[in-house]
Curated annotation (Swiss-Prot):
GO terms for biological process: ribosomal small subunit biogenesis. The gene is rsgA. GTP binds at residues 105-108, 151-159. It is an enzyme of class 3 (hydrolase). This is Small ribosomal subunit biogenesis GTPase RsgA. Residues 56-207 form the CP-type G domain. Keywords: Cytoplasm, GTP-binding, Hydrolase, Metal-binding, Nucleotide-binding, Ribosome biogenesis, RNA-binding, rRNA-binding, Zinc. Its cofactor is Zn(2+). It holds the Pfam family RsgA_GTPase. CDD domains: YjeQ_EngC (cd01854). The keyword Zinc-finger does not apply. Coiled coil: none annotated. Binds 1 zinc ion per subunit.
């Protein structure tokens, strides 16, 4: 049988196949080869999980595969907004050529942050606890897609899940389906929603980039596009001369914001 992994817990894999769930272990050969199935994987199984089908993409943290879009949930306050953290998320996700959606939460608590660049460049939404309508427009982004929610602890992922489930009469309360109450989720788990799937992930206080400087230089979609006009194929957009680096030229002309370029340089230093 072929099914999709919905949850991994204590060495067991919860697999959905033809509207039924099965809990199995992986065969020893997979473990010996250090091939670890993750949530979102399509797998072959009978009494045991025997094979992982080829993946179209994979994220390391959160560890998920075969997703259609990553929804970055980031707070404008409590925790304080950080363009550096957002750009770190974006570099990791866009490097995998995964579509990005950004949901800015707690917009009512902070109206001072300049997020215009992100609103203009990415599919983005602003939500406020005191504005129910700000959540209603989120329903359609999940339709017929496998979506993964990523973000720090405390940014409001649970609120979003509860709000969209209340706005969609086809589903039960999502947080109940995910086993979420007052406490944050501790495992990566997929559920069916709006003719697609949502993967909820644990929040975290820090995230590391696991790529080379060369990969990072092309990780942002815009950098990947514009770096093709740099003089050198492996331009890092750092110490090269202005006339040789198209990214630097676009920063100078303000087409790429200076704060984003500085975030990139900081990320570049992190992956040395």
């Amino acid at each position: 049988m072929i099914g999709r992994v919905y949850q991994v817990i204590s060495g067991f894999y919860d697999i959905k196949c033809e509207d039924k769930f099965y809990r199995v272990r992986a065969i020893g050969n997979l473990r010996n080869l250090k091939l670890n199935p993750v949530v979102g994987d399509l797998v072959v199984f009978d009494e045991s999980l025997t094979k992982i089908e080829p993946r179209k993409n994979i994220l390391i943290r959160p560890k998920v595969a075969n997703i259609d879009q990553a929804i970055i949930v980031i707070s404008l306050d409590q925790p304080k907004f950080s363009s550096f953290l957002l750009d770190k998320f974006l570099s990791i996700i866009e490097f995998q050529k995964i579509k990005v959606v950004i949901i800015f939460t707690k917009a009512d608590l902070n109206t001072k942050e300049d997020i215009g660049y992100y609103l203009k460049t990415y599919q983005s939404y602003l939500t406020s606890l005191d504005d129910e309508n700000s959540y209603k427009k989120l329903n359609d982004i999940f339709e017929k897609k496998i979506s993964v929610l990523v973000g720090q602890s405390g940014v409001g992922k649970t609120t979003i899940l509860n709000k969209v489930s209340l706005n969609n009469f086809f589903t039960q309360n999502i947080s109940k389906a995910l086993g979420r109450g007052k406490h944050s989720t501790r495992v990566v788990k997929m559920i069916d929603f709006n003719n697609g799937q949502i993967i909820d992930t644990p929040g975290f206080s820090s995230i590391e980039i696991q790529m080379s400087q060369k990969d990072l230089s092309k990780s942002f979609e815009s950098f990947d596009k514009y770096s093709q006009r740099c003089k050198y194929r492996h331009c890092l957009h750092q110490n090269e001369r202005l006339e040789d680096c198209n990214i630097k030229q676009l920063v100078q002309s303000q087409e790429i914001p200076l704060f984003r370029y500085n975030n990139y340089l900081k990320l570049l230093d992190e992956v040395k």
